[in-house]
Amino acid sequence: MADLTKLVDELSSLTVLEAAELAKLLEEKWGVSAAAAVAVAAAPAGAAAAAVEEQTEFTVVLAAAGEKKIEVIKEVRAITGLGLKEAKDLVEGAPKPVKEAVSKDEAEKLKAQLEKAGAKVELK
């Protein structure tokens, strides 16, 4: 049983690219296709798996600039490092992602910054 726990720990530490490579290697070794198995197995267990796994990467999406557009543009520039024109285009083109693949803590911090400036923000 300890070997299985160790294996689970090692598999959990794989990056997405490493997991994809592992899937390809197992498909070749066993002569199967993971796509068919996932489609059949994911239907009944999809909701349960989503409830168990907590999202680790978030995208901070600017839903609307609100009344204080200039303040929001300043915050977007500070967060992203974009130039004035690029930040203005992003704010005026809302809803748009401001920052992608960030941790939950960082996403919450960025959301608070943008909301303080007057923006409406979503985390996805």
UniProtKB/Swiss-Prot annotation:
Domain of life: Bacteria
UniProt keyword list: Ribonucleoprotein, Ribosomal protein
GO molecular function term, any single one: structural constituent of ribosome
Residue stretches in coiled coil: none
InterPro entries in alphabetical order: Ribosomal_bL12, Ribosomal_bL12_C, Ribosomal_bL12_C/ClpS-like, Ribosomal_bL12_oligo, Ribosomal_bL12_oligo_N_sf
Pfam hit, one: Ribosomal_L12_N
This protein's GO CC annotations: cytosolic large ribosomal subunit
GO biological process terms held by the UniProt record: translation
SUPFAM superfamilies according to UniProt: ClpS-like (SSF54736), Ribosomal protein L7/12, oligomerisation (N-terminal) domain (SSF48300)
Record PANTHER family: 39S RIBOSOMAL PROTEIN L12, LARGE RIBOSOMAL SUBUNIT PROTEIN BL12M
Xref: NCBIfam families: L12
Family assignment from sequence similarity: Belongs to the bacterial ribosomal protein bL12 family.
Subunit structure: Homodimer. Part of the ribosomal stalk of the 50S ribosomal subunit. Forms a multimeric L10(L12)X complex, where L10 forms an elongated spine to which 2 to 4 L12 dimers bind in a sequential fashion. Binds GTP-bound translation factors.
Purpose of the protein: Forms part of the ribosomal stalk which helps the ribosome interact with GTP-bound translation factors. Is thus essential for accurate translation.
Protein name: Large ribosomal subunit protein bL12
Organism the protein comes from: Xanthobacter autotrophicus (strain ATCC BAA-1158 / Py2)
Lineage per the UniProt record: Bacteria, Pseudomonadati, Pseudomonadota, Alphaproteobacteria, Hyphomicrobiales
